[in-house]
Amino acid sequence: MISISLPVDKYRPSSLSSLLVEGLGAYPESVWLGSNYLCLFDSQNTVESLQPDFKTLMSLPDGLGVIVTAPSSKSEYDFVSRYFAPRIGIDEDHATGSAHCMLVPFWAKRLSRSKLDAFQASPRGGLFRGEVLGEKVRLRGNTEEFLKGTIRL
């Protein structure tokens, strides 16, 4: 298990654009904007069944990508999410720490808790334990090793 502390990604309410609805193929309950769009849906099933149009999402005027989230239907997690970022070459990321810098504070406020368990419902899946610590978010989770090496400076 690894742990990393990152700055909170501040967000503000945003209007629901037709491009966002078209790109996701569904209407979120509400939308916020920080470094990414954050779209709240009513159910885990809705989040898991989204089949985004990545070409349309690529044409959104703001944000690096789109985070979709909903309360978890399973007791072992507080919320679920997925992250789509075709503008930066990632249709769907498996486990996105930077997205959780927005998600953990968002859900902490909604649930009145500072420590949360999250599931990123990508095809591979990702588990996070997040904690809001002032202006930082501490994330813990297991990693998938993809590169090993030595750098000499």
Model-predicted segments: where are they?
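Active-site proximal loop and beta-alpha junction motif in alpha/beta enzyme cores
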Residues: 1-153
